[in-house]
């Protein structure tokens, strides 16, 4: 649960239920029924991909061609979840060349705010000659569906974008399409997240500067930056950060901390808020039961963390992609009996990217440079060169509405009853505080966990 408040999900194979864990990814569990001997064996590791020589764009293109041929094989209709982003556009373009009956699905928001990408998705669908279906989410639907969504996720995941994932898959099923292709994995494999690129840069600096004079560290860190996205929230955060000077100073201090710790999730304002505040929010007995291990142990490597880029790729795939991305999407798809297929996380495709990364550094190249090179003759320029906006629904509007409807449940709810939260802090969280720099604030994480616990108690009364 402590990890949940840091990451917004419980990193696999751990679970929020004491004494219960999942079978880890890429593991085989065998049970000998003669003597009931149980054995777990890992059968694949990303980091074991052999180094690969060659031109990255060409080799990635070859693997995309192979994967796209396999991914559309089906005896039922196949669709694609399409946003305005590069990853889903790549999946749609390659699948459309091999599946004549492919159709596209997208989600938008009432009032068409700036974050609504339906027009971009529809434009690409027209370009690819794909039938296009859309669904619009309004605040009332979000509020009414909130408890059920948390139940269908199976695990607590404080991702407000989950409403959109579910809506698209439900729409596909209603249109008679039980298989949906998605672009998950592109951001994780090709440095699509600014925070991940920053982590690579800062980890390289940490390795170089651990034994360097402070003056040299300051010269490296205190540089001005432009905002990553053209959005009101991003530009506002950039201004509060004094164009990178504040975060640069924090980086100097971070690099001189635990030498075994990579720079990774600790760049997230949400992670930092949990590290600074959650122990004061927990009940006394709960604090005493928390394992003394730090939440950053996931990205701490006493034996060393080289090579940096490969290790970071594995970390983001083992954490955010696995639980917040793949697992959440799969469960919300199954809620509508829709099979989710993810060509960009095909293991041979992943091995190609990681193998190339062992020979060619790419974290300092423009975001998704290799992927853009691979598809430059497949997608139109207006898709390839579109600035990344970052997928986000109208978060604040939904957040405020959810707390107006359910916030009071935190004051004397399951989390207070079980002493996960102390009563005073639960009352503060019930107000729905949303700091300007937050993506998934502590208040929303608490609300999701409270509703998840209530749903679990409803179906399993003994909890």
Question: What residues fall within each predicted segment?
Answer:
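Short Gly/Pro-enriched turn/cap motifs at secondary-structure boundaries
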Residues: 17-21, 158, 310, 437-438
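PAPS-dependent sulfotransferase catalytic core
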Residues: 379-436
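Short amphipathic alpha-helical segments and their helix-coil junctions
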Residues: 292-307, 354, 418-437
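Short, hydrophobic/amphipathic alpha-helical patches that form generic packing surfaces
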Residues: 3-10, 315-323, 441-457
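N-terminal segments that mediate ammonia production and transfer
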Residues: 1-52
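A short catalytic or substrate-binding loop motif that flags glycine-/basic-rich loops and adjacent residues
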Residues: 21-23, 173, 313, 317, ...
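Short, motif-level signal for alpha-helix interfacial/capping segments enriched in acidic residues
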Residues: 323-327, 400
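ATP-dependent adenylate-handling active sites, centered on carboxylate activation for C-N bond formation
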Residues: 33-34, 45-290, 331-378, 395-396, ...
């Amino acid at each position: 649960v402590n990890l949940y408040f840091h990451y917004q999900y419980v990193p696999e194979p751990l679970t929020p239920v004491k004494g219960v864990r999942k079978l880890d990814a890429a593991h085989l569990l065998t049970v000998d029924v003669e003597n009931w001997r149980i054995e777990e064996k890992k059968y694949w590791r990303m980091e074991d991909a052999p180094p690969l020589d060659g031109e990255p764009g060409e080799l990635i293109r070859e693997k995309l061609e192979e994967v796209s041929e396999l991914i559309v094989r089906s005896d039922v209709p196949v669709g694609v979840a399409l946003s305005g982003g590069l990853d889903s556009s790549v999946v749609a373009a390659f699948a459309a060349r091999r599946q004549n009956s492919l159709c596209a699905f997208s989600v938008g928001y009432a009032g068409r705010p700036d974050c609504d990408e339906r027009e971009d998705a529809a434009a690409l669908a027209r370009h690819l000659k794909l039938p296009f279906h859309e669904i619009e989410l309004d605040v009332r639907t979000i509020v009414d569906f909130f408890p059920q969504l948390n139940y269908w996720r199976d695990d607590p995941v404080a991702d407000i974008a989950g409403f959109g994932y579910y809506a698209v898959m439900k729409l596909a099923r209603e249109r008679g399409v039980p298989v949906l292709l998605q672009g998950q994995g592109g951001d994780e494999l090709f440095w699509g997240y600014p925070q991940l690129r920053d982590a690579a840069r800062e980890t390289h600096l940490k390795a170089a500067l651990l034994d360097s004079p402070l003056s040299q560290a300051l010269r490296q860190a205190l540089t001005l930056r432009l905002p990553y996205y053209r959005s009101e929230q991003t530009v506002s955060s950039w201004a509060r950060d004094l164009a990178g000077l504040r975060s640069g100073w924090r980086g100097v201090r971070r690099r001189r901390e635990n030498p075994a710790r990579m720079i990774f999730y600790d760049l997230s304002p949400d992670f930092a808020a949990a590290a600074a505040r959650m122990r004061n929010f927990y009940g006394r007995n709960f604090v005493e039961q928390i394992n003394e291990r730090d939440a950053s142990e996931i990205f701490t490597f006493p034996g060393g963390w080289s090579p940096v880029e490969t290790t970071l790729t594995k970390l983001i795939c083992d954490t955010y992609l696995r639980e917040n991305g793949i697992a959440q999407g799969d469960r919300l798809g199954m809620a509508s009996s829709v099979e989710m297929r993810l060509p960009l996380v095909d293991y041979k495709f992943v091995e190609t990217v990681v193998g190339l990364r062992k020979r060619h550094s790419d974290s300092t190249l423009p975001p998704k440079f290799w992927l853009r090179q691979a598809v430059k003759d497949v997608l139109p320029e207006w898709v390839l060169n579109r600035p990344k906006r970052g997928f986000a629904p109208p978060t604040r509007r939904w957040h405020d509405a959810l707390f107006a409807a359910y916030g009071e449940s935190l004051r004397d709810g399951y989390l207070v009853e079980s002493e996960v939260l102390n009563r005073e802090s639960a009352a503060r969280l019930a107000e729905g505080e949303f700091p300007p720099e937050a993506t998934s604030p502590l208040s929303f994480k608490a609300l999701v966990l409270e509703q998840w616990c209530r749903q679990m108690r409803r179906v399993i009364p003994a909890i």
